[in-house]
């Protein structure tokens, strides 16, 4: 595999890792390269991102991990994107993530990841940007992960007065909402959206 292919793989891995980032140990294991090769690839990718005005991303090293981030010079545009009201429909991943947060709040991203079986950085960012979810403090102990809860906008969007109005789970001891409850949850969301459009 040549250097350009390795850089493409590295870029894909960093994108998929999201805010969690990747350590050089993770990169060496996944890419099957040495520690020195990983550092060289990271340096080369950093030079490409950080040294070019036509790139919108930079490579950051934070707390021993590497992650992609947007350039500070583009912050005003990103702020506008987040502030512009959007009537776009939530993706299936975002809806599933929202249901997990609604039923388990307060909950960490890692706990949501565990229930869904995949990383949920993107869906959580979308839900926060749309005002349906917010972080409410941090977990005590190592890592100090953010705790996510639903907002009053969530209640409004689903036509609920309080969280007690959420559809009840078939088995109160169940850890995950079953498919019928998830369908009911999404149906209520779609109905409220249709009413808004009328």
Curated annotation (Swiss-Prot):
InterPro entries recorded: ScpB_csome_segregation, WH-like_DNA-bd_sf, WH_DNA-bd_sf
SUPFAM superfamilies: Winged helix' DNA-binding domain (SSF46785)
Primary localization class, coarse: cytoplasm
Cellular component per GO, a single term: cytoplasm
Region feature (Disordered): 169-198
Gene3D superfamilies: Winged helix-like DNA-binding domain superfamily/Winged helix DNA-binding domain (1.10.10.10)
Keyword Cell division on entry: yes
Subcellular location: Cytoplasm
Subunit structure: Homodimer. Homodimerization may be required to stabilize the binding of ScpA to the Smc head domains. Component of a cohesin-like complex composed of ScpA, ScpB and the Smc homodimer, in which ScpA and ScpB bind to the head domain of Smc. The presence of the three proteins is required for the association of the complex with DNA.
Role according to the record: Participates in chromosomal partition during cell division. May act via the formation of a condensin-like complex containing Smc and ScpA that pull DNA away from mid-cell into both cell halves.
Name of the protein: Segregation and condensation protein B
Organism in which the protein naturally occurs: Listeria monocytogenes serotype 4a (strain HCC23)
Taxonomic lineage: Bacteria, Bacillati, Bacillota, Bacilli, Bacillales
């Amino acid at each position: 595999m040549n250097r350009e292919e390795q850089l493409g793989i590295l870029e894909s891995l960093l994108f998929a890792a999201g805010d969690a980032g990747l350590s050089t140990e993770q990169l060496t294991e996944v890419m099957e390269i040495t520690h020195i090769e990983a550092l060289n690839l990271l340096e080369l990718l950093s030079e490409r991102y950080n040294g070019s005005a036509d790139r919108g991303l930079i490579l950051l090293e934070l707390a021993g991990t590497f992650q992609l981030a947007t350039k500070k010079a583009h912050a005003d545009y990103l702020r506008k994107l987040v502030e512009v009201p959007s009537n776009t429909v939530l993706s299936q991943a975002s809806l599933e993530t929202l249901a997990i947060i609604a039923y388990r709040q307060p909950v960490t991203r890692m706990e949501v990841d565990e229930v869904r079986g995949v990383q949920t950085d993107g869906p959580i960012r979308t839900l926060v940007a749309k005002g349906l979810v917010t972080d409410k403090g941090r977990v005590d102990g190592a890592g100090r992960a953010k705790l996510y809860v639903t907002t009053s906008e969530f209640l409004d969007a689903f036509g609920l007065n309080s969280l007690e109005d959420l559809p009840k789970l078939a088995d109160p001891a169940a850890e995950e909402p079953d498919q019928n409850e998830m369908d009911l949850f999404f149906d209520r969301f779609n109905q409220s959206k249709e009413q808004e459009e009328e």
